[in-house]
Amino acid sequence: MLGVQKKRSTRKTAARKTVVRKPAAKKTAAKKAPVRKVAAKKTVARKTVAKKTVAARKPVAKKATAKKAPVRKAVAKKTVARKTVAKKTVAARKPVAKKATAKKAPVRKVAAKKTVARKTVAKKTVAARKPVAKKATAKKAPVRKAVAKKTVAKRVASTKKSSVAVKAGVCMKKHKHTAACGRVAASGVKVCASAAKRKMNPNRSRTAHSWRQQLMKLVAR
């Protein structure tokens, strides 16, 4: 417990009756202006207090106490007699005589080379081949048989076909006929020599130039 505890009241708070205080009606009293009385100033005569002359204090004469110088006692130094230690004379080491060991040169054993006796293989003397005598076969000259030429009677194209071709305006060749075919047929030639043969040839290789020319012709039409 720190400090003194405050004593608590023994009265019970429940026993107290709660008194409802009514606010008292304030009386509106007319305030009087306070009249200040001017107090008459009394002239108090000041008495001059006589100053007491305090006797000057005499300085207390200090006693000159002679300071004694501290006397230092000289401590007598003990002279310790040092014993001279006799130095042990170490016997000088004699250098150990090195035994001159003769170094043996490592003897290399030369391996005895075995002389392998090479057997000389007897070369077989191959019998020289005798050139086989070619048989002189008599070449028979090829006998050409004279083929009897058949006298083929040339068929003269009938004038009927040519007249039909002329009327149709085409030649006698089986191909894509052009305007040139009619001119050829009119002249009496049966086979046309126009460019239609080259155009219809399956082995013909087309080039960019030929394609361009063909397109130009188609556009012109």
Curated annotation (Swiss-Prot):
Record's keyword annotation contains Disulfide bond: no
Protein's UniProt keywords contain DNA-binding: yes
Cysteine disulfide partners in this protein: none
Gene Ontology molecular function: DNA binding; structural constituent of chromatin
Keywords: DNA-binding, Repeat
Domain of life of the organism encoding this protein: Bacteria
Listed GO biological process terms: chromosome condensation
InterPro entries in the cross-refs: HC2
Region (Disordered): 1-70
Chain segments annotated as transmembrane: none
Biased composition (Basic residues): 1-50, 59-70
Function recorded in the entry: Might have a role in establishing the nucleoid structure of elementary bodies.
Family (UniProt): Belongs to the histone H1/H5 family. HCT subfamily.
Protein name per its UniProtKB record: Histone H1-like protein HC2
Taxonomic path: Bacteria, Pseudomonadati, Chlamydiota, Chlamydiia, Chlamydiales
Gene that produces this protein: hctB
